[in-house]
Amino acid sequence: MRKISDTIARLAAMRAQQNTYIPTHGLSDRLSTLTDFGSNPGALRARCYLSDTLPEGAPLVVVLHGCTQDAAGYDFHAGWSQLADEAGFALLYPEQQRANNANLCFNWFLPGDIARARGEALSIRQMIESMVATHGLDRKRIYVTGLSAGGAMAAVMLATYPEVFAGGGIIAGLPFGSAATVPEAFDRMRGHGGPCKQALQQLVQRASTHTGPWPKVSIWQGSADHTVAASNAEAIAAQWRGVHGLGLDQAPTHSTSERGLTRQVWCDMSGVPKIEVNMIAGMGHGTPLGGDGLGAPGPYMLDVGISSTRGIARFWGIAKTDDKGASAQSRPASPIGKRLPSLAPTPSLELAKTRTAEPSRAGLEGSHAQGLKKVIEDALRAAGLMR
């Protein structure tokens, strides 16, 4: 655990970044609102997109926005609905509400929101069921992706409902179950501490009664991300290598490095890719975009010449392989990372929650732990990052 002085210093730096809501005024909103999808215990909003030419039995892609973002803005910048028109799949965008989190982050580490059949995870599952049942979508081709808090929540969905998903795409996210308290969340984002690789594997295996097959996972990360440390990408990969039985410390089946993109792939015994890590040199915190006509750059949506949208869909097998999003199109990432602000899942973004939180784990029980929690919460309020 970091020292209190270290935590307070980081709070001051985060305060200076002035993370505020990213408005979508003037942006094209291609999404419709999905209503009456279930009991919605997580109190989330649901948006969706279905093209007029959507084929019968089409795949479904669930997209989870990052902190300070909303569904329409993320779709505009990431270009998922453009690719949906091209490749023929439906889209579901769960959307966070301020009553749940002051800065519109999915609550990726709170026990009451990340367990099967509870909170935000159950709300998203209900949305998926409504979409599939209403529109006749393919239950064997359901995928989930997200950025930052959305990436961490995508990991939650893959772990808690593995039988639902054929694949996932985690961008600047964190391993499932790696944090359950405010101090732990701080540390994991910075790359400090966390469960060992075997424990990470067990967290997924214990999140449901599912025993396989498991979803394939595409992981994307910037090497210069100072919000979610790059070491989280390897932790996510190790978590899913263990689940897939590929070996916790197994070297990749093959690896390539070209013009700023290092791609590592782990395949099963049949040679089928199950896990990939895409590390982009010099890129900060955000979703990588390419020069392939999908989406548009903006805050935390970084034009580095590599389309993660197309790359993830290609890895899942729902987009053409002869696309323009290959690494050969890439440009140096560091200027973009420097020019655009980092989307920091700060305490105000990831950790502040206005509805009553679930009781924390035993590690925070007792007077000393409660005192430490109070000190950190006081520091958050002093920095203007928590109510």
Predicted regions and their residues:
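A domain-start/cap signature at the N-terminus of enzymes
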Residues: 1-60, 72-78, 139, 145-149, ...
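Short substrate-entry loop that stabilizes the transition state in hydrolases
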Residues: 54-102, 178
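The conserved beta1-alpha1 loop
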Residues: 62-68, 172, 221, 281
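Cap/lid segment of the alpha/beta-hydrolase catalytic domain
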Residues: 95-119, 182
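Alpha/beta-hydrolase active-site loop
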Residues: 112-135, 156
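Short beta-strand immediately N-terminal to the catalytic nucleophile in serine-hydrolase-like folds
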Residues: 144-146, 171, 220
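Hydrolase active-site cap/lid region
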Residues: 152-199, 215, 226-237
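Short beta-strand/loop motif that positions the catalytic acidic residue
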Residues: 219-221, 225
